[in-house]
Amino acid sequence: MTNLVRWLFSTNHKDIGTLYFIFGAIAGVMGTCFSVLIRMELARPGDQILGGNHQLYNVLITAHAFLMIFFMVMPAMIGGFGNWFVPILIGAPDMAFPRLNNISFWLLPPSLLLLLSSALVEVGSGTGWTVYPPLSGITSHSGGAVDLAIFSLHLSGVSSILGSINFITTIFNMRGPGMTMHRLPLFVWSVLVTAFLLLLSLPVLAGAITMLLTDRNFNTTFFDPAGGGDPILYQHLFWFFGHPEVYILILPGFGIISHIVSTFSRKPVFGYLGMVYAMISIGVLGFLVWAHHMFTVGLDVDTRAYFTAATMIIAVPTGIKIFSWIATMWGGSIQYKTPMLFAVGFIFLFTIGGLTGIVLANSGLDIALHDTYYVVAHFHYVLSMGAVFALFAGFYYWVGKIFGRTYPETLGQIHFWITFFGVNLTFFPMHFLGLSGMPRRIPDYPDAYAGWNALSSFGSYISVVGIRRFFVVVAITSSSGKNKRCAESPWAVEQNPTTLEWLVQSPPAFHTFGELPTIKETQGELQTRK
């Protein structure tokens, strides 16, 4: 009973972080299964495994997106790494609102159940993650499936907003003595910016899907031209949330990568303040570019010109981050342990994803590329190889601190190489498919596209083998087998202590700090003084 009480009613940031990780892993496996089903259907032209049920194909696409975004990346990045390490990194005893933290987590399992049950009601919700009306309207999806999906989004949104409030309060008010804002570790900064993005964007999504709910059930016409509404209004509202959302997914990853590159290059991050302001700029600009998802809906030409220019400007702070990571590695004595491999892979692949993003930012080109596989390739390069690689990198970097045991290095490196090969083989051919005009969200295609699709599907099977390696690593590390106990500082940062988590035992005590640590000087400040 005590164990049940410990995990059900926990107010400890580490326990809640662990719950988020377990939840994210379960949702991630489910989302991966859906993606493999999608790739099996697309492996050859014609109907393969779904027997011509094209609505079911769209339900799979929708579920895959929701699971990966709202139930895997966000819980693991913000809920998992955020809860586990933000309090430790700032020298705080716990989060500001521990019980709010608990309810933030426990809103997610019911939300997941609602999403999964929506697939079982009538024909499921085959709207794509954007849930555009009129397809999501009562005439096109007459059952309760879309309503259940909307309620699922509401719950997960409430969870995220409560979590954001908690992080903002914690970071502003609970820093240890001497831990000024300009001394905050970059991961903490990234979580802070992310929390503000969530707080400002999620209420807009909530408004949009609530209006959709009343359109479906109470005969309002917010998005129905017959009653003076406009479906384009929904798109504006959705993307005003949806674009900051993609930065919410990647920003904590930026923070994690900064820590890893610094640790394994044996030097402080190049241009710390520049990194901080770059993240803040990305956060602000993220709210000013939403309509680049809507270049094909008939926006005015000067509107399109503005959104093209604004979107390209986002590349500037992103470029500052990329070059600062490279400058951090420049001249460092680099150790290519598994976390560093994932970090370097992240930088390389995220840059490719960013380049295709610059291509899509051109409103003229986007007319041709919108809703083709080029877009799918673009956002999977920044998510499937950006956010997910950052998750893996963070896992290998901090796993000793979490479990108190070292991971098997060779298996970790095998996991990296299989996954790296698999995801590139899956998503690189999609650029060619998109340039040839293959449309997204369609379960069949002309024979001309068969070659690249076969290759892409083969790549996704390889990725699954890589992810199985990962769970082998987790199993070995978490069991008390041969792997040795983890030192306080497994990456030998004693000579170069950069952040507080390497000064506490592994795993940290239930209450991390007996007394709050006082910060005298950071490594970066020391460097500058020299």
Swiss-Prot record:
It is found in: Mitochondrion inner membrane. Its main location: mitochondrion. Binds 2 heme A groups non-covalently per subunit. Binds a copper B center. InterPro entries: Cyt_c_oxase-like_su1_dom, Cyt_c_oxase-like_su1_sf, Cyt_C_Oxase_1, Cyt_c_Oxase_su1_BS, Cyt_c_oxase_su1_dom, Cyt_c_oxidase_su1_bac. Keywords: Calcium, Copper, Electron transport, Heme, Iron, Magnesium, Membrane, Metal-binding, Mitochondrion, Mitochondrion inner membrane, Respiratory chain, Translocase, Transmembrane, Transmembrane helix, Transport. Mg(2+) binds at H370, D371. It is an enzyme of class 7 (translocase). It is a multi-pass membrane protein. There is a cross-link at H243-Y247 (1'-histidyl-3'-tyrosine (His-Tyr)). Its EC number is 7.1.1.9. Heme a3 binds at H378. Ca(2+) binds at E41, G46, P443. Component of the cytochrome c oxidase, the last enzyme in the mitochondrial electron transport chain which drives oxidative phosphorylation. The respiratory chain contains 3 multisubunit complexes succinate dehydrogenase (complex II, CII), ubiquinol-cytochrome c oxidoreductase (cytochrome b-c1 complex, complex III, CIII) and cytochrome c oxidase (complex IV, CIV), that cooperate to transfer electrons derived from NADH and succinate to molecular oxygen, creating an electrochemical gradient over the inner membrane that drives transmembrane transport and the ATP synthase. Belongs to the heme-copper respiratory oxidase family. This is Cytochrome c oxidase subunit 1. The gene is COX1.
